[in-house]
Amino acid sequence: MKLRYLNILKEKLGREPTFVELQAFSVMWSEHCGYSHTKKYIRRLPKTGFEGNAGVVNLDDYYSVAFKIESHNHPSAIEPYNGAATGVGGIIRDVLAMGARPTAIFDSLHMSRIIDGIIEGIADYGNSIGVPTVGGELRISSLYAHNPLVNVLAAGVVRNDMLVDSKASRPGQVIVIFGGATGRDGIHGASFASEDLTGDKATKLSIQVGDPFAEKMLIEAFLEMVEEGLVEGAQDLGAGGVLSATSELVAKGNLGAIVHLDRVPLREPDMEPWEILISESQERMAVVTSPQKASRILEIARKHLLFGDVVAEVIEEPVYRVMYRNDLVMEVPVQLLANAPEEDIVEYTPGKIPEFKRVEFEEVNAREVFEQYDHMVGTDTVVPPGFGAAVMRIKRDGGYSLVTHSRADLALQDTYWGTLIAVLESVRKTLSVGAEPLAITNCVNYGDPDVDPVGLSAMMTALKNACEFSGVPVASGNASLYNTYQGKPIPPTLVVGMLGKVNPQKVAKPKPSKVFAVGWNDFELEREKELWRAIRKLSEEGAFILSSSQLLTRTHVETFREYGLKIEVKLPEVRPAHQMVLVFSERTPVVDVPVKEIGTLSR
């Protein structure tokens, strides 16, 4: 904990904090949990949807999509397999906690080389729980040598009448924790994720260990509880464990809680109370319910071979009281726990758009990664990995699109414009599959905001301005700061996850045709919406469209080959730094933007 934060805590408590309180506040006031540097910026963003563990956006009168992106950067740097695997598990539970069945996973990976453990961790976890990994992006650069970025997006479909809130609503409710048993893994994981990676700061206890088969049981058990009307509120046990989940549930409802740590199911019997409180053991959920429903919840948990118990009561007094075998362990105001100190923000005024140079990341065939993922489990994947946005079908009717996108190569040259272009190019990719953009989730990956607060301000200002320009609001998000090694930061990397609404039956597939480059060589903000109108028009006419920041990659070539097609194009001598839009059509597109024939797609 920062010394300034410690002094604030002493002042608020009116005394010296106890050992247990220091452990608790070091977690809850960490950057990972408390968002001290970004909370004021986040309040400025245009928002949409039902907020909770994940953002929820309506597709129609019957269905909504819950979706969110999160980072597991620090754990994946230390222990690639478990770090990446538990990143998948955690974001799946965030979506699940809204009452949604998880239906899709996307990843955005930035590293200096393909780290097999990270790929295997994502693949093994996603494949084992039966949720398809339908796409993502892979960027290889030495700029991420010591700080790989592992950002994972999950989405799920929920009936509008089955949405679950993320708070307690009245005194007298109880909180049930169920899932895997609690051990010492992941203790102070949230604090570790808020630090520079230099030196020997990470220990085995900082890295969570996942069990995808327990996660699968957890998914089915929780959805059964929701279907029976037993769940009145829910929270994933992620960063901060029991402490974070139970305190957030009551803080959001302006209530309090009495937590009994001796009721938490353990797999290590000699754990200290503070260890039980902040352990980040995986595959656990907290459910708010009525006392009379608790026994049925525990019955369902046992049926699915999961542990569980009633661990807390919701009270009217706004305090967070922790007990262990009838001894008082901690008692503090619940809102003090939930509201970390906030750092002042820096106002940023953008300059003119620069003349970007192409910063080539190492080209890789991402199909070598995609092929480790099961993208067809569930049989709802309409557009598979390889071309950008994925399209998912909803069994009743309709569908949604997802895409992840980043432009660290541009943000490295100008943080503001590189970040803004990443959002606007995500709109291009979404429109390219015939979808209408609905909302975004985002992950702000940044270095040290104490050293360079201006860069963070540039990122957050660009995100706000891009959302306002495009009319696509934010539904959820995540910030991962202190991605530094020996004081050297990563490039400012905003990863955008964009959700769109689409009719899967009208999604174009590649077929033999001419290839056209559509749009301008230079990025011009005032003309961007003209390009969007052109993409929308051509998509409605049935053209297959590919938007790519590298024009044509090995991944695209190999993906066309999967369709039995061969692409031949003449690349321009000077390729633009921004994303190009390729239109595949038998005749020259008729649109109000520049069009140039550059090749063919043939059998």
UniProtKB/Swiss-Prot annotation:
Active site: residue positions: 32, 72
Binding-site positions, Mg(2+) 2: 94, 236
Pfam families: AIRS, AIRS_C, FGAR-AT_linker, PurL_C
Binding site for ATP 2: 107, 136-139, 388, 429, 549, 556
This enzyme's EC code(s): 6.3.5.3
Top-tier EC class: ligase
Subcellular localization: Cytoplasm
Binding site for substrate: 71-74, 93, 189, 208, 280-282, 480
Residues bound to ATP 1: 35, 68, 442, 477
Lyase is among the record's keywords: no
GO CC terms in record: cytoplasm
GO BP annotations listed: 'de novo' IMP biosynthetic process; purine nucleotide biosynthetic process
Principal location listed in the UniProt entry: cytoplasm
InterPro entries xref list: PRibForGlyAmidine_synth_PurL, PurL_C, PurL_C_sf, PurL_linker, PurM-like_C_dom, PurM-like_C_sf, PurM-like_N, PurM-like_N_sf
Keyword terms of this UniProt record: ATP-binding, Cytoplasm, Ligase, Magnesium, Metal-binding, Nucleotide-binding, Purine biosynthesis
CDD domains noted in UniProt: PurL_repeat1, PurL_repeat2
Biochemical pathway: Purine metabolism; IMP biosynthesis via de novo pathway; 5-amino-1-(5-phospho-D-ribosyl)imidazole from N(2)-formyl-N(1)-(5-phospho-D-ribosyl)glycinamide: step 1/2
Molecular-function GO terms, alphabetical: ATP binding; magnesium ion binding; phosphoribosylformylglycinamidine synthase activity
Catalytic activity field: N(2)-formyl-N(1)-(5-phospho-beta-D-ribosyl)glycinamide + L-glutamine + ATP + H2O = 2-formamido-N(1)-(5-O-phospho-beta-D-ribosyl)acetamidine + L-glutamate + ADP + phosphate + H(+)
Anything else known: Purl possesses an auxiliary ATP Binding region which is not catalytic, but able to bind additional ATP. The conformational changes associated with its binding could have a regulatory role in formation of the PurLSQ complex.
Entry-linked HAMAP family: PurL_2 (MF_00420)
Functional summary from the UniProt entry: Part of the phosphoribosylformylglycinamidine synthase complex involved in the purines biosynthetic pathway. Catalyzes the ATP-dependent conversion of formylglycinamide ribonucleotide (FGAR) and glutamine to yield formylglycinamidine ribonucleotide (FGAM) and glutamate. The FGAM synthase complex is composed of three subunits. PurQ produces an ammonia molecule by converting glutamine to glutamate. PurL transfers the ammonia molecule to FGAR to form FGAM in an ATP-dependent manner.
Family assignment from sequence similarity: Belongs to the FGAMS family.
UniProt-recorded name of the protein: Phosphoribosylformylglycinamidine synthase subunit PurL
Gene: purL
